[in-house]
């Protein structure tokens, strides 16, 4: 009879513990699939069993070809319970509070100790039943064995998996904290290519280490001509909660199907739940026919002849960009919006921060009270500075923003911006990253800065380490933000760390 099972090695059986992940044998001549665990009692070699036997016919009635197909047996084992599954059907649940050994096993719990894995095939015997020679030869085929261990610390740059063992696919994202749980939203990226194949993914966690997959919360549309039809590009999703309306509001950068990065739109969707589904509302450029608050009357009056500035990067071109040439160019249709983030201030006001003017200038725009549109109030910061990937946070009344330069998928030196008023004057400070590989942001690009709940002084810098040859294989970099004696934030590489 075939079995996939585990045994401990620190004591004799059964006090060492036994877990039968997959076992097949006959009970009173009837084939069964078993899911068991055994541990010790006060009697030597006397076992206490928690056993569930499911008749084989339970599976073959659903599918007569069941025996000829591969199936997945799975064990989820944590500090509280052992759960045994067959093709995602729970066969047995064994609470560890019940699995304490008797006196022979010194009242210890064998399932808090390591177990080793066995795969075997026994033939005949009491449990296997008589051997039917006519049925031989037979095959016991195993396609793979995989073991995943939940992380107890954040390890940047490695493959991160969710609680089901699947690779987390949430790139360019951000995290929302709501009612005791963190929700991580990000781009579902394909194995090859750059267009969106599924939509926006969501994962949830209570400890920032173990993430449950909540699904695609904003899928692409099957409707031909929809702004978010298959073939569009959905990037940098961020979600905020509106306390007044009770709605969860998602904004993201959208490029229309077949248009490359020309449309440069801001898109918005809304939901009654953090895990969706989100209803797509609209996409458009930002604040059409409205000038920025910090653009002078003189700059507004300038009439630009774009043909005179076709050659970029000249002193004359830089001067024109700083004075708002591209703002004027895009005035009627609205300002471009690419890499973006959202920020909710202490007074509940929300802001949309995005790369605009062909990625040359950052803009900060105030959102309406329901967070679903713009009020028309916005500013430009660092015209011609070539900033993208904004990630903003606030500490002790000071606003901080980490951005990157524009070098495509390749990493570059991060920038640190600061202000005392979000729609006020911003100034730039040196690279916040320190140490080895700091000039490349440790191989990543900023996407979000997450404030830890329960403290106003701890933040996590979130970045993506892009792999354009297979964007689905891009990695995550999460590092603690620290502050020097002057209160200026800095980021240093840490191999393994745990949020407090």
Language-model-detected regions and their locations in the chain:
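GH16 jelly-roll
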Residues: 1-152, 357, 375-384
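Beta-rich carbohydrate-recognition and catalytic domains
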Residues: 7, 17, 34-44, 151-234, ...
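Short, conserved beta-strand/loop elements in beta-sheet-dominated catalytic cores
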Residues: 67-88, 94, 391-404, 415-418, ...
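Feature marks hydrolase-like catalytic cores characterized by long aromatic- and Gly/Pro-rich stretches
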Residues: 98-151, 441-500
């Amino acid at each position: 009879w075939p079995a996939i099972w585990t045994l401990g090695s620190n004591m004799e059986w059964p006090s060492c513990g036994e877990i039968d992940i997959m076992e097949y044998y006959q009970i009173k001549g009837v084939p069964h699939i078993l899911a068991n665990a055994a541990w010790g009692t006060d009697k030597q070699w006397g076992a206490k069993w928690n056993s569930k036997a499911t008749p084989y016919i339970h599976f073959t009635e659903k599918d007569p070809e069941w025996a000829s197909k591969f199936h997945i047996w799975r064990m989820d084992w944590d500090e509280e319970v052992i759960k045994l599954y067959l093709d995602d059907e729970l066969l047995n649940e064994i609470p560890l509070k019940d699995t304490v050994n008797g006196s022979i096993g010194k009242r210890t719990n064998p399932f808090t100790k390591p177990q080793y894995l066995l795969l075997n095939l026994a033939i005949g015997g009491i449990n296997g039943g008589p051997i039917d020679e006519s049925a031989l030869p037979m095959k016991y085929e195993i396609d793979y064995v995989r073991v995943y261990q939940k992380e107890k610390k954040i390890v940047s740059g490695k493959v991160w998996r969710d609680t089901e063992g699947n690779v987390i696919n949430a790139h360019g994202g951000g995290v929302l904290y709501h009612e005791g749980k963190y929700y991580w939203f990000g781009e579902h990226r394909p194995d090859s290519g750059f267009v969106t194949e599924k939509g926006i993914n969501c994962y949830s966690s209570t400890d920032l280490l173990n993430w449950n997959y909540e699904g695609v919360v904003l899928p692409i549309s099957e409707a031909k001509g929809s702004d978010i039809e298959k073939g569009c590009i959905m990037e940098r999703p961020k979600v905020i909660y509106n306390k007044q309306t009770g709605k969860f509001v998602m904004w993201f950068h959208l490029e229309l199907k077949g248009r490359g990065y020309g449309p440069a739109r801001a898109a918005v969707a809304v939901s009654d739940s953090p895990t969706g589904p989100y209803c797509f509302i609209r996409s458009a450029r930002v604040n059409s026919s409205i000038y920025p608050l910090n653009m002078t009357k003189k700059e507004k009056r300038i009439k630009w002849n774009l043909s005179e500035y076709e050659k970029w990067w000249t002193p004359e071109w830089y001067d024109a960009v700083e004075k708002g040439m591209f703002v004027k160019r895009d005035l009627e249709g609205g300002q471009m919006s690419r890499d973006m983030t959202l920020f909710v201030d202490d007074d509940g006001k929300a802001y949309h921060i995005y790369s605009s003017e062909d990625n040359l200038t950052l803009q900060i725009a105030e959102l309406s009270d329901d967070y679903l549109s713009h009020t028309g109030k916005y500013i430009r910061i660092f015209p011609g500075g070539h900033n993208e990937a904004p990630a903003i946070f606030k500490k002790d009344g000071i606003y901080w923003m980490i951005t990157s330069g524009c070098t495509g998928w390749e990493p570059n030196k991060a920038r640190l911006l600061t202000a005392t008023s979000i729609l006020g004057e911003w100034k730039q400070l040196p690279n916040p990253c320190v140490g080895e590989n700091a000039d490349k942001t440790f191989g990543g690009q900023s996407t979000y800065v997450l404030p830890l709940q329960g403290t106003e002084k701890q933040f996590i810098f979130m970045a993506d380490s892009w792999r354009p040859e297979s964007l689905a294989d891009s990695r995550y970099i999460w590092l603690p933000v620290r502050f020097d004696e002057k209160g200026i934030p800095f980021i240093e590489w840490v191999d393994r760390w745990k949020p407090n």
